[in-house]
Amino acid sequence: MASKNTNIVSKTLVESYIRKQVKALKQSPAETIDTLTKQLLDKPKGSLEKYLLHITPEKLQDTQSGYYKLFHDILPKVNTDHLVTLGMNIGYNGIFTASKNSQTNSPESKSDALWAFMLSIDGINYEKKSAQYKAQISNAKKNGTRCFMLFIEKNAWKLLPLIKKEKDCAFFLFCPSSCLTEKFLDAVKLTKNLFISVAYNSNGNKEQILSTNIFNRLRSRKLPYGIHYYYSVSDLDNFKSGEIFKKLSKEKPLFSFFLSKKADSGKDTVTEEEKKAVYEIIIKERYWLKYPSIPFEIEKDYYYLLH
């Protein structure tokens, strides 16, 4: 009982600290990052810590830096409760718990202590498969996972009851704009542990028409959101020139996610060498951040954050 009470107190203190830092980031980004950087320098460097050290106070004071624009113009307009809840669930409930599990559990279970879990959802036949999805999420949680990346093409609203129930988890929902109805977005506004990523294009051959109005609707509700883009080898020149980062950043997403396109057969249309080339460009852009949206290559970053 004492241990449980200690955990509750510890979690409350961490949440209070995160809330304080989020508010400070909104009000004084450079000073807050300077303080956090000094704290990180005194700690062991995991993948996340090493990345955070790239966001230096100098970059936040440089008006030409994407980090300056992101922290001064975009982040302050996002609801604080969303940022705190997502930060708590990813950081304290997720990464900390997974790390603790990997240290205390048997060697066989260490490989299962994932900080994030990816799952493709069949929105059309969701009712028939919901028990399967819930079991997968439950099993991942037993191993310490508290961050879930859900990919769905239809009927994203069906996932809301599950997401709301798992209050200690963070959910990144990757879906097309067609899922984002006014009613759904109103419900998302009340779902603090949910982060929406809007598909900029489709994974298949058929190109979708994306209305920029959807981003206005997300911003009007002060929701945190990202954009995901399915890339092919024909996009390589746009990666090299930076045009693709510039294009996506115009919609003011916190994050830009990139996924390689798949053929109808499910086979990847991008070779491993081409992915590596794209990833190297993304790492460079993320370090310097010319445009105000932090880019990630889903497959590569997911792998390197786990290893």
Can you say where each PLM-predicted feature lies in the sequence?
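Charged, low-complexity, helix/coiled-coil-prone segments
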Residues: V14-I18, L25-D34, D73-T85, K129-Y133, ...
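Short amphipathic alpha-helical segments and helix-helix/interface helices
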Residues: K134-S138, L160-K164, F184-V188, S211-N216, ...
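N-terminal [4Fe-4S]-dependent radical SAM core
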Residues: K45-S120, K142
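Radical SAM enzyme [4Fe-4S]-AdoMet core and its adjacent flexible, acidic
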Residues: A2-D42, N143, C169, F195-A199, ...
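A short linear-motif detector with a strong N-terminal bias
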Residues: I95-K100, F151-E153, E272
